[in-house]
A protein has these predicted regions:
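Short helix-loop capping/hinge segments that flank enzyme active sites or metal/cofactor-binding pockets
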Residues: 4-38, 42, 92-105
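Short, surface-exposed loop/helix-turn segments at secondary-structure junctions
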Residues: 29, 60-80
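Structural helix-boundary/capping segments
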Residues: 28, 88-143
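An anion/phosphate-binding loop that grips the pyrophosphate of nucleotide cofactors and donors
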Residues: 48
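Short glycine-/small-residue-rich Rossmann-like dinucleotide-binding loops
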Residues: 56
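Small-aliphatic-rich amphipathic alpha-helix that forms the alpha element of a beta-alpha
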Residues: 40-43, 73-96
Length: 143
């Protein structure tokens, strides 16, 4: 796979190279784990309309922090730990602003829905926005 301008990011290059190092058995184990997780989420959503989870374990990183995260695999893993699993399982999600930190950085939450349940997610998102003003808040640097 040739590197093009699109793939010059060090973080993306590291992901591609990491994928090249996986054996067929490793890949099969990953696929089985993804299927197991998807089944667990399906079982939860059989009894619930939605799941609520944070988008990330801390406030949105600054631009400088985001640039350095790309070079730190563990920090990058923490950044996506609450969103990536649902990218793998294929469950629709909607992220919503849930406020600002004392320092004025945005924080986000997400609803996770049943497969094919995008309408329910949109209704839930609209309900949150009707009773809050979080979606109108702006960081100080944007005011």
């Amino acid at each position: 796979f040739p590197y093009t301008t699109l793939f010059r990011s060090p973080a993306l290059r590291r992901l591609i190279d990491g994928g090249r190092e996986l054996s067929g058995m490793d890949y099969q184990r990953i696929l089985l784990e993804a299927q197991r997780f998807t089944g667990q989420v399906e079982m939860l959503l059989y009894e619930l309309d939605l799941l609520l989870a944070p988008v990330q374990p801390y406030a949105a990183p600054t631009h400088e922090q985001l640039s350095s995260l790309a070079l730190d695999p563990e920090a990058n893993r923490r950044l996506i730990q609450f969103t990536a699993p649902f990218n793998v399982s294929g469950h629709p999600c909607i992220s919503l602003p849930i406020g600002l930190t004392e320092g004025g950085l945005p924080m986000g939450g997400q609803f996770i829905g049943r497969k094919g349940g995008e309408a329910t997610l949109c209704r839930a998102g609209m309900a949150v926005q009707r009773v809050s003003d979080w979606h109108r808040l702006r960081p100080q640097c944007l005011k």
